[in-house]
Amino acid sequence: MLHKTPFPHGYQQWMFAVSEFILRPVLWSFSEIVSIFLPTTAEQSSIMRHYSLNLPLLPLYLIVLVCLLVPALIAFFVRCILHLFRHSYILSVRLANEHHYKAPHKKQCSISTMNICLMPEFLSRFNNLSRTSQRATAVGQRIIADQIQSQNRSQAPSIVGNIETNFPEMDFICIQEAWHRDYSKTLVDELHTVYPWIIYDVGNSSLFNNYFIFNSGLMFVSKYEILHASFKTYSHSCKQCLFSGKGLLMVKV
């Protein structure tokens, strides 16, 4: 059975959305506070400008964090309970034409994999990356632009020793490190321009699996119909992986 909604019942989905709405400003303010003191390499080249632009906002972030902390703790507790009933993935389908995306009789297909580091801003900065929301949009737009160009241009012969700077035409994309739910939805909206079938928000959350923190970070993007999907959580993890529900996503197309 394919899950197109995160929960089996509508009221559970509504309660989860409300708890996420309450949590979002607290998590955002905390991330912004920590991010001030984690400048990227580009920001370190003009460190005084970085601090002069961001330090004046610190009192605002602290006010939001302190004022909403208690409601956020309650919302987090509610969200943890709801996670026990949540499906292990969401299938998003957006068809432009019912007949256009039938699986073709092809002898081969193209599959790409990519790690995109969609995490909260302060965690992305440990990888020397910033502006995660804008980066999620940019990644999706770049993939789609290259797919459209690949479809429109004639097949050129390969050049020995050539390094491609564009994404090739891809039937399927296996994405990793898409941990942030909001940024993942932004990426999904962009990719739906070409890819009608997308599985995202993959993972099971529990106290002993990931401490209700991050999902698996997996996403599967397909031009052709997804017939079945299943996710199995790894039984053991260590170090920072303890906070993400990593596992194996199995998809049939």
Model-based region annotation:
Residues 117, 203-204, 224, 232-235:
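Short, solvent-exposed coil/turn elements at secondary-structure transition points
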Residues 176, 192, 212-229, 251-253:
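Conserved beta strand-loop-helix elements of the APE1-like EEP
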Residues 107, 214-217, 244-249:
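Residues that flank catalytic or metal-binding motifs in active/ligand-binding sites
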